[in-house]
């Protein structure tokens, strides 16, 4: 149809045909759809395109992305941009602040009296307790005191082994190395002792303090130092000191080796910044502490009724987060702070790596946290400014037309095999929208915080990834593990064999199977763990939000009253989310599946298509 129609356009010229563009600005992508209307009112879809959204959704920098997408779509039908007669923009309902998602936990800053560590290749096995002694002071050691020797990387493994063998009269029970040379030293020792290596900040190790080290046998993990009472036994701690050492013990669970050093206990100071309370200003004024967890927070949100605004307790982690969102949104929208309101949040339980202060090698332990996505509304809608800017740049009329969810449901109706009443779920990067379109034309819509970006953030947080891009890729692609140069094990347990050898750099690594290439995950995380975190993050965000959004728009708030649901938006393209939703909605007897907009576009382009369809409905514009 595309090529035929483009010839048609050139032949008839612009006099009889009107070219209209529908533009959907999303949190992550900007999609456009071009259609033509003849004098006889006949309508034809011509082309579509999508580009990455430039700037925060609903702000002036979006114009660049819109122009780029329009140029691409017009280029596909061989027409210049100037030939457009009308541009219709979506009413980009509330904007989501980029910083609106973060995990909130209680921060405890303590001058730790313990240090834990976990290198990958220790040597020897067993546990040892003794006073720390630097290798350069080995000649000052006394024969009746048990020692743990400490050697910096200035000493080669041969020197370290020679010194240990030379001073056999000393009671040396363990060894801590800065270099990654535990096995090399062990092979040269006359007497076998547990050895822990790769202690980066060895200069911070306090000499003559008591320390315990433990190395587990291959394939097992340590038992004494990952247990607070085990540490108490080895280092002779009292009840209060044992309580203070619990985070260290927790951080060492599952490790192959560890060091715990007892530093002077007079300097433990705790400075707690509480997680804080959330205040809901709705039909009812309600408050809840973050520590109650995501389920109770979401129940309280529901009990509060229609929300006018949400904020947090001053000088707490959640209070600081909400005020930061409002300030950054006010800057973007050029509004006053009090004109910015948070109208919805999605809270999700997660685990966040918390750094243990005083750690020798940047150890962290996983603490319970709550991830929050917030929906932000500004008093005036910045979309009008975008329309004005586009008019200036393109010399073409631009109008803001129609609420996103309504447009998406109009677009979804072009999916073959659908009929009214129809429910749609538009799952994008920042928000999940739902709408129910009744046979008599009535529409009910809702717009909720939390979608693809929150999933990415949860994956990044729980796996402790440095790069957000890696988290985004883990969300999008299935996993595999390269087990030889000619085969890999897929995440479902199946094997895939290759006739050509795989790049040796991937050997032994977990990889992501992107179209046409493998992407190596640099972090050393087991495939099963990545799989579990990815699925759990999608389930927590998408399945929970979908049910919440559909219940909001369902007749009588009863899910069984919805016969069928069409999934649209970027996240509906995901390789597992639609199946997860099908399973979750099956118990309500709802037919649910990915949309196929206009029979060609898949789940994308629904809003842009709806903007064109709604134009035909009220073609007095332009």
Regions found by a protein language model. Give the residues of each.
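Nucleotide/phosphate-binding catalytic cleft detector across ATP-hydrolyzing
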Residues: 1-2, 7-22, 37-44, 50-421, ...
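Short N-terminal binding/cap micro-motifs at the start of the first secondary-structure element
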Residues: 29-32, 96-97
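A short acidic Gly-Thr/Ser loop motif
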Residues: 23-29, 90-92, 179, 424-432, ...
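A short helix-loop
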Residues: 467-490
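Glycine-rich phosphate-binding loop of actin/hexokinase-like ATP-binding domains
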Residues: 32, 41-56, 420-465
